[in-house]
């Protein structure tokens, strides 16, 4: 699981990524960081993967913390991966890169993405729109836009374009 609000330990970046798999080889840690689009900023740190971060990730941006958390989740290689607004603090280019990496994961994975940004959801096989804890809409991005329901209104608000044009 990777969450929007990330908890990092007072440890090295490598130690934070490998928390659930401390005996994991460095190359696998780095591969997970690359998939989470974290490798470039980690290597730019004073000690790279050996840089110590303070508890709760003091000194890192929100997006950097989220990418370390995502790398940690990817390193575990779970069959079910839950991403709770994991890319809320990253730019669109980074989010697109991460989504591509998630699509190309080796093996069979089920990924649940909890998000408010349509860009995080639009390529999902199924999208569930919740309203007061109940499923209000269900379908693909295209189907939900055609329904002209809440999802379509959120799309129009986020993209500043009518849902029928944004497909």
Predicted regions and their residues:
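Short alpha-helix in the ABC ATPase nucleotide-binding domain helical subdomain
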Residues: 70-71, 115
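A short, proline-enriched helix->beta-strand linker immediately N-terminal to the Walker B motif
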Residues: 75-79, 108
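Conserved D-loop/post-Walker B switch-helix segment of ABC ATPase nucleotide-binding domains
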Residues: 91-101
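ABC-fold ATPase nucleotide-binding domain signature/coupling loops
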Residues: 2, 9, 39-68, 86, ...
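ABC ATPase nucleotide-binding domain helical subdomain, centered on the C-loop/LSGGQ "ABC signature"
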Residues: 14-55, 99, 108
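Catalytic Walker B motif of ABC-type/P-loop ATPase nucleotide-binding domains
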Residues: 81-84
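C-terminal portion of ABC ATPase nucleotide-binding domains
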Residues: 35, 44-48, 100, 122-167
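Conserved catalytic loops of ABC-family nucleotide-binding domains
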Residues: 104-115, 121
